[in-house]
Amino acid sequence: DSKNLTDAQIQEIVPKIKELIPYKLLTLWPEKYNEVQQTKNLNEMKALLHNQAIKRLYQQINADLLQAVLIDEFCSPSNYYRYLGDQSAPLKPITYFKTKGESHHIAVAAASMIARDAFLEGLKTLSKEYGYPLLSGANTSVDELASKILKQEGMDGLRKVAKLHFANTQKAIDLTK
């Protein structure tokens, strides 16, 4: 289970995984996330991104070898397809959903590790770009850093590096008072 690995272990393993398997990775940066979050919930965003990644990967691989698509279930299959709206889901007949899929199938564990590695790399990129040592999670250090960014850059600055609907934002606002 990839959840039992440290970030350092994941960052060491992922380059090897990427050499061995085809994959597609889509990143939704905080600023765009905050924009989309105004009209779509998290599961809807995830469904749309999953579907796009699946369609792009399908174009890259030998379709004759594809036996199934397994999605780490983050919402019910009926909601997943409802969230897609008018987007096509060409692999629906062979798409399966599994809760905690990373514990049951190596492909989902690999995808989970690639996603975590991308998240960590994204934090590094945003840290360099905006000049703050960005942190993840929900703790006092994160709240204090968000408050510092808010004081120096305003809400527009925080919007570029944080998901504004998280509780950390209100805590950061409270700390600026």
State where each predicted segment sits.
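RNase H-like, Mg2+-dependent phosphodiesterase core
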Residues: 1-177
